[in-house]
Amino acid sequence: MSASHSSASRSQTIHRVEVRPGPGCVDVRGSSLLKRVVADGGAGARAINHAQVYFLSGDLNQVDLDFISRQLLADPVTQVAFAGASAVPNPGCTIEIHPLAGVTDPAAESVELAVEKLIGKVVRVQTGERWDFHGASVSEGLGVSAKYLANTVVQAVHAAPYMPTQFPAGAARVVEVKEIPLLKLNDDELEKLSRQAHLFLDLQEMRAIQAYYRGLSREPREIELETLAQTWSEHCVHKTLKSRVSYREKSLVMGSPSLLARAGKISGHSLGEVGEMVVDNLLKHTVAAATHSLMDATKPGSIDWCLSVFVDNAGVIAFDDTHALCMKVETHNHPSAIEPYGGAATGIGGCIRDVMGTGLAAKPIACTDVFCVAPPDVTVPKGCLPPARVLRQVVAGVRDYGNRMGIPTVNGGVWFDPRYVGNPLVYCGVVGLLPRELVRGVVRSGDRIIVLGGKTGRDGIHGATFSSTELTDSHADEFGHAVQIGNPVTQKKTLDAILAARDAGNKPLFHAITDCGAGGFSSAVGEMAKDIGAVVNLERAPLKYQGLTPTEVWISEAQERMVLSVAVANIAALQKLCDDHGVTLCDLGEFGTPNKELILLWNDLEMGRLSMDFLDGGLPNPVREAVWDGDWHARYAPVTAPSQKRSGGMLETLCALLAHANIGSKAWIIRQYDHEVQGTSVIKPLVGKFGAPGDAAVLQPLAHSTRGVSIANGLATGLAADPYIMTLVP
């Protein structure tokens, strides 16, 4: 059985336009790069110039091209536009950096829309950057590019002005129902399949899948295996935190704390056969148990302001009698280790979408971020990016996404430690506000599966399963496709349309909403349909380009997509709102099936069929071993710092302290963030006459109320290497 994609390839006329600073205007990008190169001891270039490059393909005459160049692409006050490629400096070289095929190009998307609005013509656009190194050789220019500018995971580097002959276009391809031989595999072969197919499921999980399909007397289809891998990934299900843990202790010294006494006295903590303590579901019986205990109305002093915990995309607490606050925080470490800008941008973008997908859509009102990276002078292992570049780019990623969406970034922190050299900590957070009566949504059988926002591409495939594996020096090559590049403008328009649909009439136009993050449609639709099933028509998904397989469409983690459960009667009204806001709407199928199944179709060809009971409840819960080693604790848990004693007076000592990376000012980061947008910040990140860092930021989210929200954070990795010991430090 097969079907075909349509072809989208044709000849094109491509125009190149360069935009650079005008006469008498400072080249900020070029001079900034030159300062960094000189400060790091680089040599070669006497001057560096920067230009933005645009490629436009379409039915454009010279008048059109001149108008677009001068009125849209270039600022007539500070910039000049040049058609074609300007001369390479002599002596010197030119290095150009362009997005790889299939990588999201947000600036190009905005230009395409603007051209259509301005002159009524549809064009295709690609962008790039040109760097002219005066007095430098090509090898020196490429060296600067590799160190400061380009990431070959998502970008192509050219040692001369680049001119494409045509834009990439998807090719026609046959769609087949691909089966994966699994039923007869032994354990070694199951583990090999899991790794080679990038499923990253362990042996017990692969055995569970094998048993399920043996019960069906058929081999699994590719799209079914991928669905299980996404749904059962560490990122999506937090299986390590939810696992059963067998805990024992050894080599305890006098005075060391012991947890074994808890066995049998606390819910979920039982005594094992050989004296160990078994915790059944670590998350449920520790972190969640503490919260639910505080909420227990039968206990004195219980709290009543936790409105929704551990069930939605973000936890929800009461703000006042009519409104609630939610907050979502998330690490985006693995992607940021490979592509820091995209990793951080999609980290904060994902938290924004989680807040949008909480209850019946919360409005994001603030962003936070914490970055932990290695010191700039640390030795960088093979396959890792320089820490200074990682920090600059993760800051830029959060800055660009939050600022362009109009959400203030009001709080954060930075910490330097050599242990972050291989995998930085990129910890993003978003606070949202929503009416209390909209804290919960419920998917209804018969509702349409509606997708709003961005189009689907190959970016982000296997991002969820990638989070379940260990980073090595080959991951930049092997998992470049797992990195997503977001478009905050698309997400801003989507947010506006969703809030308009939420506030339309007496009740929202949708019954439930979630974001399309890790695992793409597979996780979003699978999560919403877990109790009732769904039928999905994958061929309906709007694509960035043709040629994607049904499996790629299903698991793509392309950004800025939200999934809604919408009654048929509300589709027309929702479509009207989306048209008003310039947002794409797609009807992907229907929630609810007679046998509670997930059915995946492509032009009526069944690509996959899974029981929701197995997809949602079939994940094995293994016993993980945990050992408290007193000897290890004595040797490694205490954190020591080398002596910083030095001769000299108090002023010299003070200057040395202020020069330390963990003490010095972070204003260069804070000042890049817009903390005034939305007009709610009462106490800013920097306070006082001299702009010192404040203890917390305070927001006034409702104009008619003086009730405020205080946001702060703490980081204390210097207390101990063992997190439990850290809680005991007075």
Give the location of each predicted region.
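Short amphipathic alpha-helix segments
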Residues: 24-42, 66-69, 103-119, 526-541
